[in-house]
Amino acid sequence: MSLRHLAQIITQQIILPYLQINVDPNIAPHRIPYFEFDTKEYEDLSVFADAIPKLTGIGVQISESWVWDKLGIPEPQEG
C-alpha cells in the first residue's frame, strides 16, 4: 500500500464521515479537505551549511526562500 493510497483512505473513511456527521451530510466534494503525507526529501543540513557560505562568498546569488525550502525549515515570521 502506498502513502498516496493510505492518504486517500484516511480522507474517505475518516475525514469525509466526520464532516458528514458534524457539518453537512450532503457536503459538496470540492469542499472536502484531503489528507496527504509530506514525502519531500530534504537536503543534508551539514552539506548546505558548508556550501552556502562558500558559494555566496564567490558571488553566487542564492534566494533565501530557496534555501528555506531545500532544508525544510519554515521561514521566520515577522513579529
Curated annotation (Swiss-Prot):
Pfam families found in the cross-reference section: Portal_Mu
InterPro entries for the chain: Portal_Mu (IPR009279)
Protein name: Uncharacterized protein HI_1571
Gene source species: Haemophilus influenzae (strain ATCC 51907 / DSM 11121 / KW20 / Rd)
